Amino acid sequence: VEAVLFDFHGTLAQVEDPVTWLLAGAAECGVNLERLRATVLADRLVTAGRAGGPAPARIPPRLAEVWAERDLYEHAHRAAYTGLAATVDTGIDGLPEALYERVRRVEGWLPYADLAPTLRGLREDGVPVAVVSNIGFDIRPFFTTWGVADLVDAFVLSYEVGRCKPDPAIFLRACGLLGVDPERTLMVGDTPADAGAVAAGCATLLLPAAAPGRANGLGAARDLVAATRG
């Protein structure tokens, strides 16, 4: 293996817990929510659909088009998630937009504990790295804030390249940017969409779920690279 591709959400970082997310969004709207009410509302908002959260329980017909295109266009990503949040009656004016903006800011995310050590280790080993993400906004500033931007050689974001995982084209684009053959590339992710890299010719490693901010086994990527190099 000569290069590694990493998924972003659920692999390198995770969104903050739903109650913290809601409290922060409400505060932006000038509302200080009582924690018990926040817990109830947060559960309803996550069920409706949160960027970085589980799939929504249902997609209202009026949001079907923007939902289908959420990872291809910035405007669709915003419209989909603010629209889903607006289906929950929270009684707080402006909350859907505030919650969406929270997800777009680095404060709304927690890098996994082994993110920096793994990226530094791969850089020391001379292994180029790309981040390949289905997403509707720019995550590069997150890596700058976390002090690891210089350890990533390329970002391949679905809304910028017009392709989403598991389409092999997005993985091939990443390999091309790194100048490596797919057959000599490892894709590291946490969902079946990431495993779509197999169709592009890449080896694939899927990591288990881990709590935000904890170690989630990223170091296994470096171990696999080392093992293939003998």
Model feature map: region roles:
Residues 1-116, 121, 125:
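N-terminal helical cap/lid subdomain that shapes the substrate entry/recognition surface
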Residues 1-6, 30-31, 91-94, 116, ...:
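Asp-based, Mg2+/Mn2+-dependent phosphohydrolase catalytic module
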